[in-house]
């Protein structure tokens, strides 16, 4: 006989609010077209309080621009998804290339959420553009992507881990979720060398971070969302990418959000140290 019995029937039924009472920080949640917003909405729908980090100057400098309703409009959309009226949804800015910003952001989020702890960290932010192929990249490009896409994430995880370690007990539900890209699949990303290197570092660090945080009852996983329609392509280029999916459509922000939010629940408590591709069968070849 197994030492641990099978769950009772009532424990097999899915809870409609599996994250009730828990808190989350989602970085890079500054546009309603983005993955961060989709993740934040699902976290709120699952019962969690959510702090949204944004860096509007980055979006404003991109071809797609900043969200027309600004950070408060983004936060309002997340509040609409709440299933716990008492759950806090707050937001604030931060330039995570500043080495002091990650720890400050974690502390700010904890204060805003009001529970004295942070359960779920979703490192969704990334630098877009400012990149090129091997023969075009320079030191500034490499440093910019390293600072934003890799260093800031590790510093966020460090600050989160230190605060979890300081808690009087080991509360369940500790989660670190990172996002990578398709840099390790098929032909890689030769036109985005700096980005691929920086995101590849997160994929490589996933298992090491999972081992480092295991004694704090924290799981660590990374998701490659594949091509997601966040408004950065249109016309023939958009159609060409869509044709490479078996479904004939791009991934939508809520597609990876479903996986990321599930990984934050207790159903995923036995999953850690994994890099998961969520690409809808995208054909890279």
Regions found by a protein language model. Give the residues of each.
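Short-chain dehydrogenase/reductase
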Residues: 2-116, 129-132, 136
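Catalytic loop of short-chain dehydrogenase/reductase
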Residues: 28, 32, 168-201, 206-215, ...
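Short C-terminal tail/terminal secondary-structure segment
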Residues: 4-14, 239, 243-244, 261, ...
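Amphipathic alpha-helical dimer-interface segment in Rossmann-like NAD(P)H-dependent oxidoreductases
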Residues: 110-111, 148-171, 210-211, 215, ...
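Catalytic Tyr-X3-Lys loop
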Residues: 135-157, 177, 202, 247
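A conserved structural motif in NAD(P)-dependent oxidoreductases
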Residues: 245-256, 267
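Conserved mid-core segment of classical short-chain dehydrogenase/reductases
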Residues: 64-72, 126-143, 162, 166-172, ...
């Amino acid at each position: 006989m197994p030492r641990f019995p099978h769950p009772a029937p009532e424990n097999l039924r899915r809870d409609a609010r599996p994250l009730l009472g828990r808190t989350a920080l989602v970085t890079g949640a500054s546009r309603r077209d983005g993955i961060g917003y989709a993740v934040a909405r699902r976290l709120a729908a699952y019962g969690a309080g959510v702090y949204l980090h944004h860096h509007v100057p980055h979006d404003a400098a991109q071809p797609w621009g900043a969200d027309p309703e600004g950070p408060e409009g983004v936060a309002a959309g997340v509040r609409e998804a709440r299933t716990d009226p008492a759950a806090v949804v707050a937001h604030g800015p931060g330039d995570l290339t500043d080495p002091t910003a990650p720890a400050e952001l974690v502390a700010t989020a904890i204060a805003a959420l009001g529970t004295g702890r942070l359960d779920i960290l979703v490192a969704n932010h990334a630098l877009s553009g400012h990149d090129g192929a091997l023969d075009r990249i320079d030191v500034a490009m490499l440093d910019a992507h390293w600072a934003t896409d890799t260093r800031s994430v590790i510093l966020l995880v460090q600050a989160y881990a230190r605060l979890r370690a300081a808690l009087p007990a080991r509360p369940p539900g500790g989660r670190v979720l990172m996002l990578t890209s398709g840099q390790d699949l098929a032909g890689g990303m030769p036109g985005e060398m700096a980005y691929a290197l920086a995101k590849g570092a997160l994929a490589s660090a996933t298992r090491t971070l999972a081992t480092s945080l295991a004694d704090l009852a924290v799981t660590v996983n990374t998701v490659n969302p594949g091509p997601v329609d966040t408004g950065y392509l249109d016309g023939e280029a958009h159609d060409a990418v869509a044709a490479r999916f078996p479904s004939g459509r791009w991934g939508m922000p809520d597609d990876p959000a479903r996986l990321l939010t599930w990984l934050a629940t207790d159903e995923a408590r036995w999953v850690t140290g994994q890099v998961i591709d969520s690409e809808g069968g995208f054909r890279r070849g």
